[in-house]
Each structure stands twice: as structure tokens, then as C-alpha cells.
């Protein structure tokens, strides 16, 4: 049954060249990424690495992310999204954890995302910083 899902993650957008290398017609890309990085599925995962994807409504394509999922709640209420860069302390902590998967991570590539969406439709791609 469909309901709202809330996620809070430290997020790294997987580069297109990696996606292009893994993509094939026989398997779902998300399954290939789970195998490639040997991480858990995102459902109910907390304090661990997972793969998430989201539909980018601007280009109608999916974006894929390696996330350190801090929190997951099924049955949350309402749609919202917040994205910010990590503080220096957060970046120092999480960039070390992500170094297991990627050697060099730029200061602006890791983001803290906190959002809720209705899972009866495609999960949105939550990564871009919005200027106010």
C-alpha cells in the first residue's frame, strides 16, 4: 500500500560515466549498483550505506545516489525537501566513510538531504541546492 516515506541521508550523486559502464539491458541499474558497491537496499535502512534513485523532473531521467542513510520512516506525513552542504565537521566525518567507495570527493559533492515523498509515484531526485 502507498504512503509517505521520509528519508534523511548524506548523499553523493553517482557520476554518469560510472552509470554508463554498468548499464546493461538484462538487469535493473539499481540492482547493478547494489552489487557494485555491496550495500543494502534502502527500505528501512538506517545508519548504513545504500543506493537510492530519483526521477529528475527537469530532464525526465533517473539520477542515482550512494547514500549514507541516517533515517528512514514509512508512514511519515507530507511532502517536503531540504538540501544543504555539509558543515566542515560533517564533511570530515562522512568523506572518510565515502572514501571506501570513491577516492576523491569534492567539498560540494556530499550533501545532507532530508525529504518526504508519496511512494505511490516516482521518488523525486533530491540533490540540487536551491538559491534563495
Regions found by a protein language model. Give the residues of each.
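Short, extreme N-terminal segment that most often corresponds to the first beta-strand
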Residues: 1-42, 114-119, 127-132
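Charged interaction segments
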Residues: 57-132
Amino acid at each position: 500500500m502507498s504512503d509517505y516515506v521520509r528519508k534523511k541521508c548524506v548523499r553523493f550523486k553517482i557520476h554518469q560515466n560510472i552509470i554508463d559502464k554498468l548499464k546493461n539491458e538484462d538487469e535493473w541499474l539499481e540492482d547493478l549498483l547494489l552489487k557494485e558497491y555491496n550495500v543494502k537496499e534502502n527500505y528501512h535502512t538506517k545508519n548504513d550505506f545504500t543506493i537510492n534513485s530519483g526521477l529528475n523532473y527537469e530532464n525526465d531521467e533517473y539520477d542515482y545516489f550512494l547514500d549514507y542513510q541516517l533515517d528512514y520512516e514509512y508512514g511519515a506525513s507530507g511532502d517536503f525537501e531540504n538540501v544543504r552542504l555539509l558543515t566542515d565537521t560533517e564533511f570530515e566525518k562522512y568523506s572518510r566513510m565515502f572514501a571506501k567507495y570513491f577516492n576523491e570527493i569534492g567539498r560540494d559533492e556530499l550533501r545532507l538531504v532530508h525529504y518526504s515523498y508519496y511512494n505511490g509515484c516516482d521518488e523525486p531526485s533530491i540533490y540540487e541546492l536551491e538559491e534563495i
